[in-house]
Amino acid sequence: MKGLIQRVSEASVAVDGETIARIGPGLLLLLGVERNDTLNEAKELCRKVLSYRVFPDEQGRMNVNVQAAGGSLLVVPQFTLAADTSSGTRPGFSLAAAPELANRLYGDFVAEASGLLGAGRVGTGEFGADMKVALINDGPVTFMLESGQRGSCTKM
């Protein structure tokens, strides 16, 4: 499971021209589910996202997580994060989870985040929909996080 997090001043997601979720300061998470992912990966990545320290402390260093910063989380499903881009000029999606599994694990991730952060601080996109995501990136600060791999957090 992969998550691209971006520290934002605000973010929103719209479907068919209607805004379905909006957050103020916090994290926008684009979530990609891979074919071998399980509930364990969803919970692991959720804990990593919520505890990852990307907000400034009193000295201006990235040392505060979204929970302690009082921020919100907007979770948007994005299957293209599971693409295989290792060859050619066209991505392959054989590593992406089947829609049924991906939707279930997306829901599990959102439920875990809502339980840990509070439902009022978690917004969601719509699985399988053509979404328009708007954000004001703060920094910019963007990281790719992955479950199941030690040391897999990579600065973008």
Swiss-Prot record:
It catalyses: glycyl-tRNA(Ala) + H2O = tRNA(Ala) + glycine + H(+); a D-aminoacyl-tRNA + H2O = a tRNA + a D-alpha-amino acid + H(+). It comes from the Bacteria. GO terms for biological process: D-amino acid catabolic process. It is an enzyme of class 3 (hydrolase). Keywords: Cytoplasm, Hydrolase, RNA-binding, tRNA-binding. SUPFAM superfamilies: DTD-like (SSF69500). Its EC number is 3.1.1.96. Its main location: cytoplasm. The keyword Metal-binding does not apply. Signal peptide: none annotated. It is found in: Cytoplasm. A motif (Gly-cisPro motif, important for rejection of L-amino acids) lies at residues 139-140. Pfam families: Tyr_Deacylase. GO terms for cellular component: cytoplasm. InterPro entries: Daa-tRNA_deacyls_DTD, DTD-like_sf. One of its GO terms (molecular function) is tRNA binding. A Gly-cisPro motif from one monomer fits into the active site of the other monomer to allow specific chiral rejection of L-amino acids. An aminoacyl-tRNA editing enzyme that deacylates mischarged D-aminoacyl-tRNAs. Also deacylates mischarged glycyl-tRNA(Ala), protecting cells against glycine mischarging by AlaRS. Acts via tRNA-based rather than protein-based catalysis; rejects L-amino acids rather than detecting D-amino acids in the active site. By recycling D-aminoacyl-tRNA to D-amino acids and free tRNA molecules, this enzyme counteracts the toxicity associated with the formation of D-aminoacyl-tRNA entities in vivo and helps enforce protein L-homochirality. NCBIfam families: D-aminoacyl-tRNA deacylase. Belongs to the DTD family. Homodimer. This is D-aminoacyl-tRNA deacylase. It comes from Marinobacter nauticus (strain ATCC 700491 / DSM 11845 / VT8) (Marinobacter aquaeolei).
